[in-house]
UniProtKB/Swiss-Prot annotation:
Zn(2+) binds at H66, H68, H236, D311. 4-imidazolone-5-propanoate binds at R75, Y138, H171, Q239, T316. Pfam families: Amidohydro_1. The lineage of its organism: Bacteria, Pseudomonadati, Pseudomonadota, Gammaproteobacteria, Pseudomonadales. GO terms for cellular component: cytoplasm. Belongs to the metallo-dependent hydrolases superfamily. HutI family. This is Imidazolonepropionase. Fe(3+) binds at H66, H68, H236, D311. Pathway: Amino-acid degradation; L-histidine degradation into L-glutamate; N-formimidoyl-L-glutamate from L-histidine: step 3/3. Catalyzes the hydrolytic cleavage of the carbon-nitrogen bond in imidazolone-5-propanoate to yield N-formimidoyl-L-glutamate. It is the third step in the universal histidine degradation pathway. It is found in: Cytoplasm. Keywords: Cytoplasm, Histidine metabolism, Hydrolase, Iron, Metal-binding, Zinc. GO terms for molecular function: imidazolonepropionase activity; iron ion binding; zinc ion binding. Its cofactor is Zn(2+); Fe(3+).
């Protein structure tokens, strides 16, 4: 069905800029954008349906390119403890922290994980999200990593949202491998990753490169295996210290390196040369009350593409609003509203390997867009909350009104 969407203003986000078309119209057909431009220039095509958007601003559908949306349990009790002065180390010694999420995730059935994750993903969708990445990483063995990735696939089948699944088995050391990190990396490379990839559950491979997780050398072994299986890689890097994980990621043409508070100018140069996207996660920065800012000037100076994401997870960023992350990106990281919007559209698409098909309003790309109740694009970063999406369209079909 061909649909003509008109009486709107479009922030197309081509080349990562607002690239505004005033009094715009969009023609969609077969799930794609067939034409976009000024309303007065609409080509003489026969539309099966004409939709008046009432002067709304239209942007690409939002893309949350870094989430841990599938998990069991609840860690709000730890939040209370931390506010009372209990350290993370003390919480971990009591069996809390990521270990508690691993236990709860392992204990939960696939259907239970699906039900809880569905609510979180739907909350993001109500914010205008049409594409989301979901990582595993709370199973830490083949059976439970498979369970998490199956849930991610099922969410993409059951909900009107595009889901990309990332294997993050190298997220933390499982209790059965205490003191044997190298053995665990071997297990991921030799057993887990080949099996999960063969089952079609993996779109990319991620790891956590940090003193409290895995070393650059261990991550590199994982990257070599992933690339050998034809899978792109991503990396949690430079969140708590500088191990030059982002440079390692760039060496393997990673789709993205994420967090990056402690990255250096050398790392930024390497990422720029490789085309690796910097995914900034202000929710975790805020929730943990961190003070080390990502090097925004270096990222801009060297032309690194910058994305923003929610980092939705139970321990460090229980954020169910990607629009809130737009504001945090501006207020915490000194991004401009234009940079922030590019960070959840075109650059987020690139961070998922979807830059050719998603993230901007261009002919031939998927017809994913949101019509907003706003006066100008900067309002999306300005307002804290509010029911701003007027219509959400995915693959040319309206999914909310």
């Amino acid at each position: 069905m061909r649909t003509l969407w008109q009486h709107c203003h479009a922030a197309t986000m081509t080349e990562g800029r607002y690239s505004v078309i005033e009094d715009a119209a969009i023609v969609t057909s077969a799930g794609l954008i067939e034409w976009i431009g000024p309303r007065g220039d609409v080509p003489p095509v026969t539309a099966d349906r004409v939709v008046d958007l009432g002067g709304a601003w239209v942007t690409p559908g939002l893309i949350d390119c870094h989430t841990h949306a599938v998990f069991g349990g609840n860690r709000s009790g730890e939040f209370e403890q931390r506010l009372q002065g209990v350290s993370y180390a003390e919480i971990a010694a009591q069996g809390g922290g990521i270990a508690s999420t691993v236990r709860a995730t392992r204990a939960a059935s696939e259907d239970a994980l699906l039900a809880s994750a569905r609510q979180r993903v739907q909350a993001l969708m109500r914010d205008g999200v049409t594409t989301i990445e979901i990582k595993s990483g709370y199973g830490l063995d083949l059976e439970n990593e498979r369970k998490m990735l199956r849930v991610a696939r099922r969410l993409g089948e059951e909900l009107p949202v595009t889901v990309r699944s990332t294997c993050l088995a190298a997220h933390a050391l499982p209790p059965e491998y205490t003191g044997r990190a190298d053995d665990y990396i071997d297990h991921i490379c030799e057993q887990m990753l080949p099996a999960l990839a063969a089952e079609g559950l993996v779109d990319a491979v991620d790891a956590f490169c940090e003193h409290l997780a895995f070393s650059p050398a261990q991550v590199e072994r994982l990257f070599i295996k992933a690339r050998g299986l034809g899978l792109p890689v991503k990396l949690h890097a430079e969140q708590l210290s500088s191990l030059h994980g982002s440079s390692l990621a760039a060496r393997y043409q990673a789709l993205s390196a994420d967090h990056l508070e402690f990255m250096t100018e050398e790392d930024a140069i390497a990422m720029a040369k490789a085309g690796t996207v910097a995914v900034l996660l202000p929710g975790a920065f805020y929730f943990l009350r961190e003070t080390q800012l990502p090097p925004m000037d270096a990222l801009r100076r060297h032309g690194v593409k910058i994305a923003l994401a929610s980092d939705l997870n139970p321990g460090t960023s229980p954020g169910l609003s990607l629009r809130l992350m737009l504001n945090m990106g501006c207020t915490c990281f000194r991004m401009t509203p234009e940079e922030a919007l590019a960070g959840v559209t075109l650059h987020a698409a690139t961070a998922l390997g979807l830059g050719h098909s998603h993230g901007s309003l261009e002919v031939g790309k998927v017809a994913d867009f949101v019509a907003w109740r706003i006066e100008r694009p900067a309002d999306l970063s300005y307002w804290l909350g509010g029911d701003l999406p007027k219509r959400v369209v995915r693959l040319g079909h309206e999914i909310s009104n």
